[in-house]
């Protein structure tokens, strides 16, 4: 393809900025990144409090986050943040030790069974489900894999046929039941559901295991974590500064027309002409009466074709809420806490995890995280969820004295099992490049 083509990238989050970096490395330098907000980073948002940055979005990484490491190397930065740790509480606020046999004598048989199932699960993923951790979803519904290996930072291209991969379209809970490893859900749930990715009875196993492949999950379990002193947003600020064409902030896109082999983007009232367009912003946001969250999808401002509308209208997303709160000194938690009891559908809207970022100072905010949507439940209204979380903090013994920041974010776009099984990703892959998009 001609290296002089003009490429428009919509979105200055991790995906959009990374697209610019990889294009630049391949010799494509006529790209423009349009970001509607006054900052880059998307869901990596790290505001300041008392001269230090805290996390309203992404918090941490692990050594198997190879794409993030690509950015670090490109920018000459590294993961230099505070060492995180955590404990656990039940929904009544009592500190528990769910994985320590000596603290749970009655649970020793279950913990031993979990350990056996974990070993079995690792073996199954490497053998029966070979290719499960290959980057991307193409081919999975057809029983094949094609992409880049997650086994090492080299990410060599791999492909192959494995009919068992079709099982990954099942909800993760059913996938575990099918393979006799139900108890591994107790391990995977912490870095999955509490991080906003939904519930195991609704989310296809493919999402769970491609995000949390065995190696990545074990890094979380062993607290082998990366953080950044200046926050995850700093990664993308650094990348933006190193790009030849930094993102143009406060870019409001009003219309996109694709015709006669060109792409016409109306941004801040001006029409700009491109040869290709890359979309890293939401493709579809379901319509809802009285919506005031400002969310729009690609199909709302593009000259969307019928095949695009048909596919993208199957996209769902999570309602994931974050509060940053202050506490009185005597109420400040000594460490971060996970609340497993609240990571199940019937506890929708309750506090799942709350983080203390810095060990050396209590003059900081605590951030809380909650989910408000399950496919078989009514969405919990934002204000109701907010009140529930603040009440939960009281129950935990760490009541908030004030809320200093809050965010409800369009999060984790995905499709459910029927659409996944029907080859949704392969249909989308077949459209790549169509309409110069």
Give the role of each language-model region.
Residues 26, 252-366, 370-377:
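Mid-domain catalytic core of redox enzymes
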Residues 69, 73, 78-202:
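Mobile amphipathic helical/loop "lid" adjacent to a hydrophobic cofactor/ligand pocket
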Residues 43, 51-83:
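Conserved FAD-binding subdomain of flavin-dependent enzymes
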Residues 211-262, 276:
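Helical element adjacent to the flavin cofactor pocket in flavoenzyme catalytic cores
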Residues 15, 39, 284:
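Conserved Rossmann-like nucleotide-cofactor binding loop
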Residues 5-32:
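N-terminal Rossmann-like FAD-binding beta1-loop-alpha1 element of flavoenzymes
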Residues 351-437:
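Conserved flavin/dinucleotide-binding core of flavoenzymes
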